[in-house]
Amino acid sequence: MTDYKATLNLPDTAFPMKAGLPQREPQILQRWDSIGLYQKLREIGKDRPKFVLHDGPPYANGKIHIGHALNKILKDMIVRSKTLSGFDAPYVPGWDCHGLPIEHKVEVTHGKHLTADRTRELCREYAAEQIEGQKTEFIRLGVLGDWDNPYKTMNFANEAGEIRALAEMVKQGFVFKGLKPVNWCFDCGSALAEAEVEYADKKSQTIDVAFPVADADKLAAAFGLPALAKPAAIVIWTTTPWTIPANQALNIHPEFKYALVDTGERLLVLAEELVESCLKRYNLEGSVIATAQGSALELVNFRHPFYDRLSPVYLADYVELGAGTGVVHSAPAYGEDDFVTCKRYGMVNDDILTPVQSNGVYVESLEFFGGQFIWKANPAIVEKLSEVGALMHTETISHSYMHCWRHKTPLIYRATAQWFVGMDKQPSTGEPLRERALKAIEDTQFVPAWGQARLHSMIANRPDWCISRQRNWGVPIPFFLHKQTGELHPRTVELMEAVAKRVEQEGIEAWFKLDAAELLGDEAGQYDKITDTLDVWFDSGTTHWHVLRGSHDIGHATGPRADLYLEGSDQHRGWFHSSLLTGCAIDNHAPYRELLTHGFTVDESGRKMSKSLGNTIEPEKVNNTLGADILRLWVSATDYSGEMAVSEQILQRSADAYRRIRNTARFLLSNLSGFDPARDLLAPEDMLALDRWAVDRTLLLQRELEEHYSEYRFWNVYSKIHNFCVQELGGFYLDIIKDRQYTTGANSVARRSCQTALYHISEALVRWIAPILAFTADEIWQYLPGERNESVMLNGWYQGLSELPEGTELDRAYWDRVMAVKAAVNKELENQRTAKVIGGNLQAEVTLFAEEGLSADLSKLGDELRFVLITSAASVVPFAQAPADAVATEVEGLKLKVVKSGHAKCGRCWHFRADVGSHPEHPEICSRCVDNLSGSGEVRHYA
């Protein structure tokens, strides 16, 4: 028996079937480095329009987790797709370097005995070490960027730039010193930003406390009574007994009704709506003898339960009726609403009682409780209230309460002297900051769109921004305050520039070692040099100033404004937020044009990632087992607008999808063996109809993908590429062309037409996947035929695709109908294989009973219909002639019948044909194969 294998154009490529990504990816990284890929991109992009994605800096502490990987991969996919779309898209990675976590790490490692200077020195060393580790991990993910020159908030230039940004805000009148309640952590010994606060359940002791009336006549008049018949008190309810020693007022709602309730021994003032529940809680009987509008009780004085001072009634809209008594006890030093209300009633800072120190211990001079830690003092306070007859009720509840995100310990509001950026303070020119920021939000694009309402709500309701911290490792607030007046030096902005110049040379240490006389001369004795440092959110929030127009000037045609900020949804209250405020304060616009928010990673059951649950996914482990491209494919396949599920099983599914895409690429490459585009590429008009359709379909898909990429809809990109590989290519086109590719003459029009289409598809596909499968795309690029540059990323979207001309007889709609018919035939062929009627599809002969229009369409292909259906014979018969055993299909106007061929099998093309053996020199093959071997070769027109 003759072996005809050598006469076939069998596929051949060195592109490996097995990806081996964990081993191959590091080699590709080395190649990118050796060719200077990032620098080459900057060179070829210098005259292109710019697209700047500004990197939100991760904190320089610890190994990267799956959230970091997700974030950096999303950014890289955008930068790569923008590059392919013709933009110069630089990517400068950054790191957030100052702040408490690093200072805390240094203290834990080296002890708390360190001097401030030594602490800063060790913090700088630690941050640098952490950055190197994280940098290696980010590069391993395939993230293209300026890794040799990243920005770091601890770089001297950036520290100096931050001081200059603060000076701009001082100059415009946004910065002030004030006493205000701020989120305070006893363990940090510092104020916390809103973004550093998290909520967790806490058990608290609630108390109902009676404050005896001090002005009985005024209270009686408020209730429309001539006098009070017995002692009276107003009752408050609180979950913070420790604040009672700092009570200075009582807040009620002006529009609620309040009742005077006779309980026998005394009269109680309670919100009318809550009388019944309160009396039940106190185990008392009582009756309402009078009611009054809350506004009538304004400025009625009551007495503190155990201190000799008054507590006046103030009106406040924030009082609620959900729980308690409808009366809120006010300790202005320890509650933001209380503080605002007391200030509205004329209380000055010196009047506000602040008995709790920075470590949570009452000052020694506080009567009864001096020297006690506030949480431990609660029982003593309750006991004192009981002793004086003021305690109405106490119980323990569990409720959501603010905690430090680092120490996981409860926080308090604590009024301290701090530096603030005023939200509603009138600047020297223009609108207040809140107004500016809200306008800027309207001018910003949000992806997803709901982010706009979320950020708007946060800005609309936020308090002034406390920007000062009492720590060592941070950018200093370089102010000099007059010792007598407490006022800033009149030349503050000028002095800040002098400090910035020193910091540019020596880092933040320059301020801390500075002798005031060096800048102030003879005035030095009149001023205090302050040692507060800036909130780390000010560090990262001003990168648009000290990075984009400073250390890494972007040279954007429209100024130092990023096109895109991209971070997790928590950054609406973090980096997006602080950047918006500083941008609007300095430049009167947001520092970004568009904000993209991604969700958090969860496991496949929707649970948060947690080491205790054992459901964390470590990027390093994925890189070393499956490869970074699998992680990148998972990111692209997942809708980032909500929670993003990831697990070993989910990543395995991504690996399966990857194999399908890789196998498609390998098929394309292997069938381009011997193809030289410079020599063999056919013009569109010389190609077969099916091949022209395949190129046209590729062009249409490319247009869709470009749009999805521009809208950052990567899951649509992934699904469409995957479906194209599996369905339109694998399930239709590539199956059909195998016969023509393998059996026709090596240099025949039929084969070169097919290879031309495969070449165009390959050139397009390798670019489509480049933003997602960064390593694999560049690997494929090395195996494509024809002259090419060193990396797929040095190119744009493929421009060699052609559209089917209008009026083409076998147009898109035609091939859609053919695909539907082929799907129906495939279904019946599978049934016949299952029933053992046929062994393989080529053993089948199919008769199509079609209505007139469909019959005419299918008949256009003539004998080539069998190649489309991949059967040994196919005939089209009028629908009316369908026998009873013809199978109905889902295609309207189509029935079909499959029978097993009775002919011999061709030993070369494997078709079962009547003419097998008709040529005496080749008794084992069909006449078509004989013609392809020794004759002029078969001619194909369509498929």
Swiss-Prot record:
InterPro entries: aa-tRNA-synth_I_CS, aa-tRNA-synth_Ia, Anticodon_Ile_BEm, Ile-tRNA-ligase, Ile-tRNA-ligase_type1, Ile-tRNA_ligase, M/V/L/I-tRNA-synth_anticd-bd, Rossmann-like_a/b/a_fold. Zn(2+) binds at residues 906, 909, 926, 929. Its EC number is 6.1.1.5. It catalyses: tRNA(Ile) + L-isoleucine + ATP = L-isoleucyl-tRNA(Ile) + AMP + diphosphate. GO terms for cellular component: cytosol. Its main location: cytoplasm. The keyword Ligase applies. It is found in: Cytoplasm. Binds 1 zinc ion per subunit. GO terms for molecular function: aminoacyl-tRNA deacylase activity; ATP binding; isoleucine-tRNA ligase activity; tRNA binding; zinc ion binding. A motif ('KMSKS' region) lies at residues 608-612. It comes from the Bacteria. Keywords: Aminoacyl-tRNA synthetase, ATP-binding, Cytoplasm, Ligase, Metal-binding, Nucleotide-binding, Protein biosynthesis, Zinc. ATP binds at residue 611. Its cofactor is Zn(2+). L-isoleucyl-5'-AMP binds at residue 567. A motif ('HIGH' region) lies at residues 58-68. One of its GO terms (biological process) is isoleucyl-tRNA aminoacylation. The keyword ATP-binding applies. PROSITE patterns: AA_TRNA_LIGASE_I. IleRS has two distinct active sites: one for aminoacylation and one for editing. The misactivated valine is translocated from the active site to the editing site, which sterically excludes the correctly activated isoleucine. The single editing site contains two valyl binding pockets, one specific for each substrate (Val-AMP or Val-tRNA(Ile)). Belongs to the class-I aminoacyl-tRNA synthetase family. IleS type 1 subfamily. Monomer. Catalyzes the attachment of isoleucine to tRNA(Ile). As IleRS can inadvertently accommodate and process structurally similar amino acids such as valine, to avoid such errors it has two additional distinct tRNA(Ile)-dependent editing activities. One activity is designated as 'pretransfer' editing and involves the hydrolysis of activated Val-AMP. The other activity is designated 'posttransfer' editing and involves deacylation of mischarged Val-tRNA(Ile). This is Isoleucine--tRNA ligase. The lineage of its organism: Bacteria, Pseudomonadati, Pseudomonadota, Gammaproteobacteria, Pseudomonadales.
